[in-house]
């Protein structure tokens, strides 16, 4: 089966663009990019060895630009969906601020620039991983999985989990257990996060024809899956502590954060109708963002604290 939707090909004459700088910034999905940059930064700082500050900044910029490029290509391909959903109707392409050819050119240019710069100036292991991340998000997730299976964000979540792996490879030129643990945390965090969103945006996804789990399997089944994935997430996030990769401070914090996320997931499972159900899903969605940032912030603070201790010891 082809992953290319021929309906997405532009057959009309190009029109004059009204795009401004803000529109092109919006194409980069700044909120998503902030998560990409933050998790990548943690992966980079956890990596062993010395890394020149100029190369570190270069690598972070390339990862950020690569993530933004993937977002632009996602918007290029999904303009038909975005125009039908309340949450995305104000994006630059549905609003007519940016044309599809402009978004495509913008995304491809940034993708090429970020991958080549990272490969040439840093190393090609990181460059290849960044290229794979962009490819996976744009082709595997956006063009194929999102429109074809209710497991779209489960499999597609791998793309969002790769930035810390890319950043680790930028420092070391190789892979190790630690970045794969970070990958696993983000990977198992993705389903409960996005399914909570899908529960209170169910009508949006149904109207656009996107086979999100609540649309295909129903809300009750989705609530069960959220609970099951949250249980797995809590275990996976805590595992690096007893395995000796992360500290006891991280371990205790991960259990505390995970415990509260599990409580919120249980509320989503129990409250299935009315305002209580809506409030439960919104609370889980909001906390899931805080959960991931807090978990990675603890790792970041530990790295900084160790560096300061070595400096003054």
Curated annotation (Swiss-Prot):
Pathway: Porphyrin-containing compound metabolism; heme O biosynthesis; heme O from protoheme: step 1/1
InterPro entries for the chain: Protohaem_IX_farnesylTrfase, UbiA_prenyltransferase, UbiA_prenylTrfase_CS, UbiA_sf
Residues annotated as transmembrane: 32-52, 53-73, 120-140, 153-173, 180-200, 226-246, 248-268, 284-304
Bilayer topology: Multi-pass membrane protein
The protein's Enzyme Commission number: 2.5.1.141
Gene Ontology cellular component list: plasma membrane
One biological process term in Gene Ontology: heme O biosynthetic process
Gene3D superfamilies for the chain: UbiA prenyltransferase (1.10.357.140)
Catalytic activity: heme b + (2E,6E)-farnesyl diphosphate + H2O = Fe(II)-heme o + diphosphate
Subcellular location: Cell inner membrane
GO molecular function annotation: protoheme IX farnesyltransferase activity
Annotated keywords: Cell inner membrane, Cell membrane, Heme biosynthesis, Membrane, Transferase, Transmembrane, Transmembrane helix
Keyword Amino-acid biosynthesis attached: no
Class of enzymatic activity (EC top level): transferase
Other observations noted: Carbon 2 of the heme B porphyrin ring is defined according to the Fischer nomenclature.
Family to which this protein belongs: Belongs to the UbiA prenyltransferase family. Protoheme IX farnesyltransferase subfamily.
Function: Converts heme B (protoheme IX) to heme O by substitution of the vinyl group on carbon 2 of heme B porphyrin ring with a hydroxyethyl farnesyl side group.
Family annotation (HAMAP family): CyoE_CtaB
Protein name: Protoheme IX farnesyltransferase
Name of the encoding gene: ctaB
